Swiss-Prot record:
Keywords attached to this entry: Cytoplasm, Lipid biosynthesis, Lipid metabolism, Magnesium, Metal-binding, Phospholipid biosynthesis, Phospholipid metabolism, Transferase
The protein's name in its UniProt record: Geranylgeranylglyceryl phosphate synthase
Matching InterPro entries: GGGP/HepGP_synthase_sf, GGGP_HepGP_synthase, GGGP_synth, IGPS_HisA/HisF
Function, in words: Prenyltransferase that catalyzes the transfer of the geranylgeranyl moiety of geranylgeranyl diphosphate (GGPP) to the C3 hydroxyl of sn-glycerol-1-phosphate (G1P). This reaction is the first ether-bond-formation step in the biosynthesis of archaeal membrane lipids.
GO biological process: glycerophospholipid biosynthetic process
Species assigned in the record: Methanocaldococcus jannaschii (strain ATCC 43067 / DSM 2661 / JAL-1 / JCM 10045 / NBRC 100440)
One Pfam match: PcrB
GO molecular function, one term: imidazoleglycerol-phosphate synthase activity
Binding sites annotated in the UniProt record for Mg(2+): 28, 53
Keyword Transport in annotation: no
Main location: cytoplasm
Length: 253
């Protein structure tokens, strides 16, 4: 079986090439007002991620509800092997590379591989890296992470280079859901420069100006999740900031 890039990933790459950055919104399947949130983001996000670190309830129904509201690609962001749905378009096939538990590094994605094939989901190979202060968030606890310090950008960059050598085309630099502060610019810039793969940044990004500076630092994609639950209307300002920074980044190339 020949490995090839699927249509969702091609679309994301095209947006990055033409607009400089992608805006991904993360929806938690357990949110009661999931339809309202989807309605608020459908005109501004480039794709919708669905997933969470703790528990999955009626994932199929959640994805179907979102599909009725928007034609945006739905990318699964599984917290475990039960975070898969045949109704989604793609899945971030990820390894939590800096977990102390090999289950999260390789066993969980391996156990999910046959289901992904069976469901005909498009796998998007991605390194998932949890960076300070992620240890204080749900993903840090569940994923048993060896947290990468913010003041050691070379460590994150080396993980990204390793991911590239493993054949991964994306790396997600995660500060954690509800993080008190985001991944710093130096870490983003060095990770992008050393690896050259697509860099996603999420966690602790609550203001448009923060998203703007992360894109200029080298982020190819920005993820917001908690922001949508706290202030769904903020998505428009976030989108505008990301696209503005993307254009500037392309101009400066």
């Amino acid at each position: 079986m020949k490995i090839k890039i699927g249509k969702v990933e091609k679309r994301l790459n095209q947006i990055i090439e033409e607009e400089g950055a992608v805006y991904l919104t993360l929806l938690d399947p357990e949110e009661e007002n999931i339809e309202e949130i989807a309605e608020n983001v459908k005109d501004y996000a480039d794709a919708i991620m669905v997933g969470g670190s703790i528990g999955i309830v009626n994932l199929d129904e959640t994805v179907k509800k979102i599909k009725k509201i928007t034609k945006l690609p739905i990318i699964l962001f599984p917290g475990n092997v039960d975070g898969l749905s045949r109704y989604a378009d793609a899945v971030f096939y990820m390894s939590l590379m800096n977990s102390a538990n090999t289950y999260w590094v390789v066993t969980a994605p391996t156990l999910g591989a046959i289901t992904i094939l069976k469901y005909n989901l498009e796998p998007i190979p991605m390194a998932y890296l949890c960076i300070e202060p992620a240890k204080k968030t749900a993903v840090g606890y569940v994923g048993e992470i060896r947290e990468i310090p913010q003041n050691k950008p070379k460590i994150t960059a080396m993980y990204c280079l390793s991911a590239k050598f493993f054949g991964m085309r994306w790396a997600y630099l995660e500060a954690g859901s509800g993080a008190s502060y985001p991944v710093n610019n130096e870490t983003i810039a060095l990770s992008k420069k050393l690896s050259g793969i697509n860099i996603i940044v999420g966690g602790g990004i609550r203001k448009p100006e923060i998203a703007y500076e992360k894109v200029l630092a080298g982020a190819d994609a920005i993820v917001t999740g908690n922001l949508l639950e706290e202030n769904p209307k903020a998505v428009e300002m976030m989108y505008d900031a990301i696209k503005k920074a993307g254009k500037e980044k392309l101009k400066n190339k």
